[in-house]
Amino acid sequence: LRDAQALQGLIQRGVEAFGGVDILINSAALFQRAGLLETTETIWDDQFAVNLKAPFFLAQAFARALPPDRRGHIINLADWRALRPGAAYVAYYLTKAGLVALTQSLALALGPQVQVNAIAPGAILPPPGGDEYFKKVAARIPARRVGSPEEIVKAALYLLDSDFVTGEVLLVTGGEHL
């Protein structure tokens, strides 16, 4: 996901395999705990390459490959912390805030042919060994539970079904963002 040419090739393989691509979901992400003082250049570069550079160049390749008579959708998986960052994952939060800005810029640049939106999940899948932490998270959010991958799928299906939603960030947090 670091090589813009390889990303172009991914879209091209999709076009060749399926006769075209009209949906792009950017969901790959690196999530590495590193505060301001712990963030190295390598952590910074890795986070930005996967979380922001790849979605940009995939969207560019997608837009170039989409025939002018077809409509398309791009959905970027952001994070609710893009809108309310903390201190523990500085580079990650910055990349997800950048992904929200990219979502809105792409909606302006590619509309009306392509609708571009983001989903900003809250607590969905615990990190390895994070089950106890997720229990604490669930206790403090209004839904009193963490989400499931199926809820992200439902949000994506809503965005794909809509023909009037673009440039939006759909929070799927159970109220964790409040």
Model-found features: residue ranges?
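Substrate-binding pocket helix/loop in short-chain dehydrogenase/reductase
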Residues: 35-36, 43-48, 129, 137
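Alpha-helical segment proximal to the catalytic Tyr-Lys
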Residues: 64, 108-112
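C-terminal substrate-recognition "lid" of short-chain dehydrogenase/reductases
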Residues: 148-172, 177
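Active-site helix of classical SDR
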Residues: 59, 95, 103
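Short, small/polar-rich loop/turn modules that mediate ligand/substrate recognition or access, typified
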Residues: 111-115, 166-168
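Conserved NAD(P)H cofactor-binding loop of Rossmann-fold oxidoreductase domains
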Residues: 27-32, 174-175
